[in-house]
């Protein structure tokens, strides 16, 4: 069942999702602006989805956006007349209201819901479009969209094209079924393929005035309730199978307890199915008669959704990390989110060009996924804050392969990256001398160039806050080993832009005196690399550093 069709149910007392996030520290004017813009965006999405059958955003992002709206409204006491289903409401009454379903937030919530219940069943939560199917004398005569649960749109014009749906029952029954129209998929594994926009395809087709037979043949039906059916779920499923609705029994399992529910949830998440799903439905065998059903979440059904494939995250700040070569990487600092089993508070945008393209500012809401199930990745900007906070962006012209050889406020990050590379395993391989140590030494004024550490004494180190006697001894030992590393390791550590297989010889002077033609003669060195090598070796800061290393009697200099 589509999540958007259940939104009004979440406003009922006791059904709102728990939200333990702190309230933003915003003045009233900004709070009103943020809520107003969020309402406009949601209204725009609702209108496109319900009138045109076009989903502008994934269901899970829509759901999280609704939750964020409720959070802000609760924080700032900003009630609204927002009606998510205003454009979904049709003119035709359902013979039996669609109840919707309450969502269980996490495993403890599922365990609490199951506690003490008997006769439980579990089914896949098919990701499609909810409908009522009205049969008269065994013939399908009316097809109604869920609408607002009470009034739906008449989609009966599509019945002749829906060849995969039972249009004539084997018995002349006058009855109503409720179910999900879904887009038929071959061997669809939800954990791997995600939703595949399956629900959006069906919603878009049904919003049309007319379907072709080919389009209609792609639509299947999963009957999930028979309001006037037998009293027990087992009997209902058996009779549904006899009537031709075989998937209902095929994908329904009687369970006892949480462990069984968790097993089937994982099984259907990772097993090939003929439709997309977004969780499982837990269903109690006993239920009241259909005359008492209302368009609200009932006590006898609940949904346990799959983990989000995308999470909505609010940007707290933007930091621009500058690497050793001057590459600028924007890092979004996020309000922490949970995605799968990971807590994420930072995500890289990869390049300055991508940040410029997306124009992300603090306060914006972005969609975050896990690339390869491990690496956080920004998929899109979902909501832009009406307050476009200024962002201080490093100038790419100030940071490049030959910039920042000394400590300064503008060069702090790139210079620290140079030190970390020099002492790392690609350079001098000084154990215990990482970014934190270099930061301490630079902040205390003990290191301002790439060679200053060669002059540090025990007394110098003990003057640095956070460095005691034992640590000072370990650092001196690491520095001593680093000093004695071979010439080639020093060159790699300083960032010589040569191919990995290049053998530099044993003398800096000979290396620095090479011309472009000599570099071009080296295997793997083209025109661009030759120019980089020439510029590196002739740069005044690099030459000054080489002279200092020669004064320290470093091998090769």
From Swiss-Prot:
Q: Which organism is it from?
A: Pseudomonas entomophila (strain L48)
Keyword annotations for this protein? Answer: DNA damage, DNA repair, DNA replication, Ligase, NAD
Q: Which SUPFAM superfamilies match?
A: DNA ligase/mRNA capping enzyme, catalytic domain, Nucleic acid-binding proteins, RuvA domain 2-like
* Class of this enzyme: ligase
Q: At the top level of its lineage, which domain of life is listed?
A: Bacteria
Q: Which family does it belong to?
A: Belongs to the NAD-dependent DNA ligase family. LigB subfamily.
Which Enzyme Commission number(s) are on file for it?
A: 6.5.1.2
InterPro entries, alphabetized = DNA_ligase_B, DNA_ligase_CS, DNAligase_adenylation, DNAligase_N, NA-bd_OB-fold, NAD_dep_DNA_ligaseB, NAD_DNA_ligase_OB, RuvA_2-like
What is the role of the protein in this entry?
Catalyzes the formation of phosphodiester linkages between 5'-phosphoryl and 3'-hydroxyl groups in double-stranded DNA using NAD as a coenzyme and as the energy source for the reaction.
Q: State if DNA damage is listed as a keyword.
A: yes
Q: What is this protein called?
A: DNA ligase B
Record-annotated active site:
125 (n6-amp-lysine intermediate)
Annotated GO biological processes are: DNA repair; DNA replication
GO MF annotations for this entry?
DNA ligase (NAD+) activity
* Catalyses which reaction(s): NAD(+) + (deoxyribonucleotide)n-3'-hydroxyl + 5'-phospho-(deoxyribonucleotide)m = (deoxyribonucleotide)n+m + AMP + beta-nicotinamide D-nucleotide
């Amino acid at each position: 069942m589509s999540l958007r069709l259940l939104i009004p149910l979440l406003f009922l007392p006791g059904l709102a999702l728990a939200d333990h996030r702190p309230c933003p520290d915003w003045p009233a004017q900004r709070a009103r602006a943020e809520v107003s813009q969020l309402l406009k965006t949601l209204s725009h999405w609702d209108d496109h989805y319900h009138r045109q059958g076009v989903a502008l955003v994934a269901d899970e992002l829509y759901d999280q956006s609704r939750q964020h709206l409720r959070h802000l409204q609760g924080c700032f006491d900003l009630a609204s007349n927002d009606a998510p289903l205003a454009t979904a409401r049709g003119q035709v009454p359902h013979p039996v209201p669609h109840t919707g379903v309450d969502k269980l937030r996490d495993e403890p919530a599922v365990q609490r819901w199951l506690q003490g219940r008997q006769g439980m069943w579990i089914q896949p939560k098919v990701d499609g479009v909810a409908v009522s199917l009205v049969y008269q004398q065994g013939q399908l005569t009316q097809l109604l969209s869920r609408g607002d649960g009470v009034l739906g749109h008449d989609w009966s014009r599509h019945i002749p094209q829906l060849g995969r749906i039972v249009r004539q029952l084997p018995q002349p029954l006058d009855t109503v079924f409720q179910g999900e129209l879904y887009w038929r998929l071959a061997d669809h594994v939800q954990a791997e393929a995600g939703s595949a926009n399956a629900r959006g395809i069906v919603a878009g087709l049904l919003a049309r005035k007319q379907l072709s037979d080919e389009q209609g043949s792609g639509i299947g039906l999963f009957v999930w309730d028979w309001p006037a059916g037998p009293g027990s779920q087992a009997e209902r499923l058996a009779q549904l199978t006899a009537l031709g609705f075989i998937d209902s029994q095929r994908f329904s399992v009687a369970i006892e307890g949480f462990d069984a529910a968790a097993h089937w949830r994982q099984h259907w998440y990772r097993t090939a199915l003929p439709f997309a799903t977004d969780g499982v439905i837990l269903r109690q065998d006993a239920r009241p008669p259909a005359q008492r059903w209302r368009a609200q979440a009932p006590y006898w059904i609940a949904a346990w959704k799959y983990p989000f494939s995308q999470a909505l995250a609010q940007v707290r700040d933007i930091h621009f990390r500058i690497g050793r070569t001057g590459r600028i990487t924007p890092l979004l600092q996020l309000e922490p989110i949970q995605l799968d089993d990971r807590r994420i508070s930072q995500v890289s945008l990869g390049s300055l060009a991508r940040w410029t393209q997306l124009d992300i500012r603090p306060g914006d809401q972005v969609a975050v996924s896990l690339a390869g199930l491990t690496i956080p990745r920004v998929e899109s900007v979902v909501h832009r804050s009406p307050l476009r906070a200024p962002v201080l962006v490093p100038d790419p012209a100030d940071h490049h392969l030959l910039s920042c050889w000394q400590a300064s406020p503008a060069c702090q990050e790139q210079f620290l990256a140079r030190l970390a590379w020099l002492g790392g395993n690609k350079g001098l391989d000084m154990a215990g001398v990482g970014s934190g140590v270099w930061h301490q030494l630079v902040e205390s004024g003990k290191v301002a160039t790439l060679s200053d550490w060669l002059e540090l004494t025990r007394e110098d180190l003990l003057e640095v806050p956070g460095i005691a006697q034992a640590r000072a001894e370990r650092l001196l030992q690491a520095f001593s080993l680093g000093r004695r590393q071979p010439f080639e390791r020093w060159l790699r550590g300083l960032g010589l832009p040569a191919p990995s297989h290049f053998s530099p010889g044993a003398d800096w002077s000979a290396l620095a005196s090479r011309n472009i033609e000599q570099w071009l003669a080296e295997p793997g060195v083209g025109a661009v690399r030759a120019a980089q090598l020439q510029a590196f070796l002739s740069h005044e800061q690099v030459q000054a550093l080489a002279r200092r290393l020669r004064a320290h009697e470093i091998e090769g200099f």
